[in-house]
C-alpha cells in the first residue's frame, strides 16, 4: 500500500508519466534497490509536500494463469481531507499464449481520477511495448466526464478526426495503430480513431 502524509497527488505528472514509465516507480517497481534514485525522484514529483493533505490506499497485483498470462497491478489512492480525490493507477500486461514465447504482448498503463468537488471523472491509458506477432501495437485513449452544472462526456480512442476541434482539457492522443511494415523501402501502418 501507500501512505503519504502531508503530500498531494500531482495527476498532471502522472498523466504525462503514462508515456515515460512513471508507474514503474509506483506500482511494484522492479529491482527497487538498484532503481532507488529514479524511484525516489519519481515519488517526489508525483507526491509533492502539501501541508494538511494526505494520500493513502492499497495496492494489489493480480496474476491469472499458470504460467502467468495476465498481470494486473492496481493502486486505489484516496487524497484527504476535502476536497476528496480518488486516484486509480493501473498497469496491465497480457502475454499469449505464454510468457516465454508470446505471440500477443499487450502492455497498458492507465490513470483514473475521480474529483468529487469538481464533479469530474477522467481516465487516460496508453499502450507501450505491445505487439501482435511481430507487428507493433500503439495507441492512447482518454475519457472525460462531468456532472452537476456542466455535464459532459467525451471518449476518444486513438484521438479525433483531424478536422475536429478536440474539447479543451484533452491531451494529444496517439492513433490506435498496428505497424505492419517499417522498412526503408516499405512502410505499412493501420490506424484508427
Predicted features, each with a name:
Residues 1-193:
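Extended assembly/interaction regions that build large supramolecular complexes
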